[in-house]
Amino acid sequence: MKLIFERSRPGRGNGLLPSLDVPAAPLPEKYRRKTAPRLPELGESDLSRHYQALARRAFGVCDGFYPLGSCTMKYNPKLGEEAAALPGFTGLHPLQPAHTVQGAQAVLNRTEHLLCEITGMDAVTLQPAAGAHGEFLGLLLIKAYHHSRGDTGRTVILVPDSAHGTNPASAAMAGFTVKNIPSTPEGLVDLEALRAACGPDTAGLMLTNPQHRGALRERHPGAHRPRPRRRGPRLLRRGQPQRHHGGGPAGRHGLRRVPPQPPQDLRHPPRPAAARAAVRWGASRFWPPSCPVPPCVATAESTPSARCGPSTPTSWWSSRPWAYLLRLGNTGVAEAAHTAVLNANYLKRKLEEAGYTAAFPGLCMHEFVLTLEELKKETGVSALDVAKAMLDAGIHPPTMYFPLIVHEALMFEPTETESPETLDEAAAVLAEILRRAKEEPEALHAAPASTPVGRPDETAAARRPVVRYAFPED
């Protein structure tokens, strides 16, 4: 299909600006562009068709089953969209006086209170805008904590070898050196290796729990002191906090930092590709002095004070999880967590019965990992081939080749919003793909056959990305 710039024609715009309702003020010369921006110019019908064509090439939760592991691609209740669309949120300006945004600040304050209740933390900040952003914030807080004590020699962050690639990247960006901690054959952090890695230069540990293999470490490293007499916070990357509800808040596990992701795990907004949604950070009581400002605190009259500071997009994002949590209540949130775990174990068992091999045996939490290593050796069919074949059946592929400690990995996360019938249909599709892999492997090498886009050159896209349109006159 044509790019939007290729459809553009000079003067064919459809913008209608409202009449000016404030005194006109000239823009200072230093802020003016020297040349006009090269924006696409299309009629509204062409513009609408262009984006409809793009939508047909995409796959969303409303199009079908979306078991993308570690991303929690659950269905979004429309109630959250109504809450986020209220003028009191969408019409806010960052520089409005605090007394004019008391309603939005009340939502922020109440959202923080609910998240503290869920996580067991003493304080929450709503500042981060994305998952890796949240990691980065946590690492900066770790650095600020050590520096506040005059301890500037702690420059090493411990990261499990099964961690998200964003973990070491965030640590490096925050100025730390990364030291990898190996996993046990069960896919859990090797505590002996962790003890050996700890030293006077250790700043902290980044840990995902449940871990990406789908297992819950019931006792966190540090709860049984793998780092005796050594100071170092634990940064728990709790990607799916609702999976823990009813199982004990993080604050009771000795954790000091935890980033729940309400818009993602409790209620996430639509997002392109697999981009993370906004992350909220929780901290135990000795962290708040280092937390980002402005905090949203309540006065004795139970109304948010002016300390909330300028309004930010946080209020718009926070209205979604706030509405979601209020709608579910304590019982509903716990039921959602239990259903997510039940769905993952149900689908895992169905796929094992169909002939697939789980990377790690036993019960899982919210997600699980298959290994297709033996299938590839026997038939030449890879995890990529199976994932592409799922697209022909109207199912979005799971996460591929992650975690890195599992060869030919497929990570499934069915989420709690999927029905048993959907899981049965997905299991049947994957059973048929397995049969085809053994009987007609060449057909799977060519999958998908029915989608608008087949197999793009992902290596070239990663190494030579084209992120800017090449205008003919350039």
Which functions belong to the PLM regions below?
Residues 103-106, 133-303, 342, 355, ...:
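Conserved PLP-enzyme active-site core in the AAT-like
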Residues 129, 184, 208-210, 371-375, ...:
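Short strand-loop junctions, especially beta-strand C-caps/beta-turns
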Residues 1-123, 308, 325-474:
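Non-catalytic terminal extensions of PLP-dependent enzymes
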Residues 69, 127, 160, 208-212, ...:
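Glycine- and other small-residue-rich loops at beta-strand/loop junctions that grip anionic moieties
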Residues 59-79, 127-135, 263-280, 313-317, ...:
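Conserved phosphate/anionic-ligand binding catalytic regions in large, soluble enzymes, centered on
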Residues 122-128, 156-159:
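A short, small-residue-rich loop immediately preceding and capping a beta-strand
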